[in-house]
Amino acid sequence: MDTTMEADLGATGHRPRTELDDEDSYPQGGWDTVFLVALLLLGLPANGLMAWLAGSQARHGAGTRLALLLLSLALSDFLFLAAAAFQILEIRHGGHWPLGTAACRFYYFLWGVSYSSGLFLLAALSLDRCLLALCPHWYPGHRPVRLPLWVCAGVWVLATLFSVPWLVFPEAAVWWYDLVICLDFWDSEELSLRMLEVLGGFLPFLLLLVCHVLTQATACRTCHRQQQPAACRGFARVARTILSAYVVLRLPYQLAQLLYLAFLWDVYSGYLLWEALVYSDYLILLNSCLSPFLCLMASADLRTLLRSVLSSFAAALCEERPGSFTPTEPQTQLDSEGPTLPEPMAEAQSQMDPVAQPQVNPTLQPRSDPTAQPQLNPTAQPQSDPTAQPQLNLMAQPQSDSVAQPQADTNVQTPAPAASSVPSPCDEASPTPSSHPTPGALEDPATPPASEGESPSSTPPEAAPGAGPT
């Protein structure tokens, strides 16, 4: 605004704006910043959680009408609180706008879309409840099933179209010396656009107020005659809570808008009413912050869903703690390997039948030597190495059958039928002692074939899978 236009408007008693003429008289300060920051820190996560809960409920098909309403309302409140971040930035700079014209237009457009969508959505909800209360027999049968989806989509489209002027007219310009402010309308188009803003906001609010009063009066008159279903009572309780809070906290802003339009060209009254608009806008922010908590208090389904989500999250956190995890499987594998057994015996033992594993004597395993195992204790040899039991009995049949076979029958009862049921290792090793002229050479400890017969290298790879019963 140049000085010539300002002088002409000052001479006629009209001014383009009535907010501020001096940087020192800026009414908003530190307490406003603290209040707005507290609302943002409380309201943004709450509305985000409400949108996620309502989206999950609508995705699973539970309470679709209420879920779509709460999802749209939570998104509207979230955007309205996000637009307040620009207001905090402006307050911190003492009314100076440091972001330029593009950010100024985006700020007013975001504010207009979020404010109009919430207002139109609650007006449609109030009208729907009023028709349901006044025509309880006719309206439910004639209402389309997809009406909530159509209403929510139409509300967002209408709010976007209604906020298009805020993408065109706002501008960041020098107002007082080097003070740059973000103005929504200038003098030439302010009156017409202010009237559009007031009518576009006041008429839906008036429809909401009238329908809400009629619905509450009808509900009080018919509540003693008939009992509603639990789902209808829950939806009515949530809608009543939201609409009542909206009427109480947004009515001052609508009244301040009407008075501001009436005294638009009055300097002092316009300035006071501008301050009234600013602080009544804080009430709208408070309503957007409290709306998720009011919905949770009024809806039992949302409280149950929130408790289940929080309990699942707490259980996941407890599982991720280092002290709560005990690796049971690796400990079982370490115990089953047996540190005192040689490596080929451990492989053969892991492939045996679990029925024969508990019969191994753990006290005799550390003393068993693979090279001198037949001399230490021939009777305990089938227990320490069940895979080599058929070979010892076949190769040393003339000398050790009379001693080792009865003891193997009395001490070890289960491996005997297991060895007889798998004849493949015994049948393959049976021609070997018949080819040697001296079968007693196996009892000599200095002979290399005896040590090779018990050593890991003499065990064929194909004999390990057939060592135990399958």
Curated annotation (Swiss-Prot):
Residues 1-25, 322-470 are annotated as: Disordered. The keyword Transmembrane applies. The chain crosses the membrane at residues 34-54, 66-86, 106-126, 149-169, 195-215, 258-278, 282-302. It is a multi-pass membrane protein. Residues 325-335, 348-414 have a biased composition (Polar residues). Residues 55-65, 127-148, 216-257, 303-470 are cytoplasmic. Keywords: Cell membrane, Disulfide bond, G-protein coupled receptor, Membrane, Receptor, Transducer, Transmembrane, Transmembrane helix. Residues 1-33, 87-105, 170-194, 279-281 are extracellular. SUPFAM superfamilies: Family A G protein-coupled receptor-like. One of its GO terms (biological process) is G protein-coupled receptor signaling pathway. It holds the Pfam family 7tm_1. GO terms for cellular component: plasma membrane. Residues 415-425 have a biased composition (Low complexity). One of its GO terms (molecular function) is identical protein binding. It is found in: Cell membrane. Disulfide bonds join 104-182. Orphan receptor. Belongs to the G-protein coupled receptor 1 family. This is Probable G-protein coupled receptor 152. It comes from Homo sapiens (Human). The lineage of its organism: Eukaryota, Metazoa, Chordata, Craniata, Vertebrata.
